[in-house]
């Protein structure tokens, strides 16, 4: 997304999806035009082989799960949706966010112990594809809650109950939080590193 889920909220996510349909045809060709004379990355290059290996290891890990309490990917998808709906909706608070983060981590641990993927990895396997997506959703759901907990203000669709004006309206803190958050995984488990890109609103006139 071009803004993230915790300031402008769902509108930005929808805008990013819709805008892509008419911006990508003009931006991607222009980018590729500057690389027409470059050699293609060989299939046996170190970069390509590393990417293939990482993908294969992830698939193998998922297919090799044989837990004592098996469930399909949809079981975990539904539970994650409920957790985010009640713990990281438009109205958020510190206690619920912390609790939701812990519950998502527990759900992810159970996913990697008990998720059941029928069929074979080398066949057309839609359940495998779904399982890989749910694995991503679990990581993304945790990060959304971490970002909502980290953003110590109220703004737009990010409504923190501990940051309200006397009239009960959202209380922004542009002095400290007027930036886009971009996160990357850290080296340790459950660790994320935030990068901040400042927002400049001087050209906006209301």
Name each model feature, range by range:
Residues 1-204:
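Glycine- and aromatic-enriched mobile tails/lids
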């Amino acid at each position: 997304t071009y803004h993230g889920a915790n300031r402008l909220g769902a509108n930005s996510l929808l805008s990013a999806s819709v805008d892509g349909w008419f911006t990508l045809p003009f931006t991607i060709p222009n980018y590729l035009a500057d690389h027409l004379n470059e050699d293609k990355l060989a299939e046996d290059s170190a970069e390509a082989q590393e990417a293939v290996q990482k993908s294969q290891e992830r698939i193998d890990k998922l297919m090799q799960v044989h837990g004592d309490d098996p469930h399909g990917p949809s079981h975990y998808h539904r539970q994650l949706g409920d957790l985010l709906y009640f713990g990281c909706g438009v109205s958020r608070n510190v206690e619920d966010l912390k609790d939701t983060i812990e519950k998502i981590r527990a759900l992810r641990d159970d996913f990697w112990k008990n998720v059941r993927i029928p069929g074979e990895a080398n066949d057309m396997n839609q359940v495998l594809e779904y399982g890989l997506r749910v694995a991503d959703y679990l990581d993304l759901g945790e990060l959304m809650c971490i970002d909502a907990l980290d953003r110590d203000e109220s703004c737009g669709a990010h409504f923190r109950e501990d940051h309200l004006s006397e009239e009960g309206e959202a209380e922004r803190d542009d002095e400290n939080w007027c930036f886009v958050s971009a996160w990357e995984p850290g080296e340790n488990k459950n660790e994320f590193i935030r990068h901040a890109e400042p927002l400049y609103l001087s050209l906006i006139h209301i």
